[in-house]
From Swiss-Prot:
GO terms for cellular component: extracellular region. This is Bacteriocin curvaticin. Has antibacterial activity against the Gram-positive bacterium L.monocytogenes. Stable below pH 6. It comes from Latilactobacillus curvatus. It is found in: Secreted. Disulfide bonds join C9-C14. InterPro entries: Bacteriocin_IIa_dom_sf. Keywords: Antibiotic, Antimicrobial, Bacteriocin, Disulfide bond, Secreted. The keyword Lipoprotein does not apply. GO terms for biological process: defense response to Gram-positive bacterium; killing of cells of another organism.
Length: 30
């Protein structure tokens, strides 16, 4: 999980960090 980012994309899929997802969707591309 990365602070301030709700969605984290890996090689094959994206995961959601529920603790930081609110208001921070799609900010992390790596």
């Amino acid at each position: 999980a990365y602070p301030g980012n709700g969605v984290h994309c890996g090689k094959y899929s994206c995961t959601v960090d529920k603790q930081t997802a609110i208001g921070n969707i799609g900010n992390n591309a790596a």
